[in-house]
Amino acid sequence: MRAPLLLESRDYLLSEQMPVAVTNRYPQETFVEHTHQFCEIVIVWRGNGLHVLNDHPYRITCGDVFYIQAADHHSYESVHDLVLDNIIYCPERLHLNAQWHKLLPPLGPEQNQGYWRLTTQGMAQARPIIQQLAQESRKTDSWSIQLTEVLLLQLAIVLKRHRYRAEQAHLLPDGEQLDLIMSALQQSLGAYFDMADFCHKNQLVERSLKQLFRQQTGMSISHYLRQIRLCHAKCLLRGSEHRISDIAARCGFEDSNYFSAVFTREAGMTPRDYRQRFIRSPVLPAKNEP
């Protein structure tokens, strides 16, 4: 198996002293699996796509945030009008006496440590900081180098204050419409999602919410739910021994035949063939061995 492409710091950071850079992806195209000599913060502003991080697939859209370590490997697939910012930084070049280890997860080896969502308010606060950071990181004077680190710290604090786990949006004091619906969908991977009931409980207008969701993500609510269910199915196919019919049920598909048809259409292969890709073949002994 070929090693992933390595992205080098010198190709993205203006000098060996500059700690931070911003790469705008307007839009983000399909990008092969790669790793880095630096760390990244990825913030998604619009559109959607499939982000595969350390072999874990995520259907990403507006408000998703990833903290990516240098040794992580990831790729972008099936992108549709995907707009995001990559904030690149080298931890060894940061000199401010800040609690970076608390501000920039992942904090441990657990899966999904690097995946968060950002509130609408947090996105509004982060955007101008990133714009200024992009400007300063293109300069080489000592003051700009120091200012980029200050701006990175400011951004890290804003993200810390306004990030949340997708399944915990209901704990936010003032849940925005998009935050609430994203949380509800994440909790409906294996169960029926009643849109009318959700809107009634949260005092939302269904038609307006559907329009807002499509405007921000580039897809309908039902399509997004189907996509994140398929991502969950891929994880189970790769990392569990559950029967395909059980996986279908765990991912909200009552009919395993329908699940297989949808999966095949989206992935270009059957669930069984997809699973086979991640099963290691046994090493056969040489012919002269007993």
From Swiss-Prot:
Gene3D superfamilies membership: Homeodomain-like, Jelly Rolls
Site feature Interaction with sigma-70, where: D246
The name this protein goes by in its record: HTH-type transcriptional activator RhaR
Species annotation: Yersinia pestis
Keyword NAD: no
Lineage start: Bacteria, Pseudomonadati, Pseudomonadota, Gammaproteobacteria, Enterobacterales
InterPro entries named in the record: AraC-bd, Homeodomain-like_sf, HTH_AraC, HTH_AraC-typ_CS, RhaR_RhaS-like_N, RmlC-like_jellyroll, RmlC_Cupin_sf, Tscrpt_act_RhaR
SUPFAM superfamilies, alphabetized: Homeodomain-like, RmlC-like cupins
Domain of life per record: Bacteria
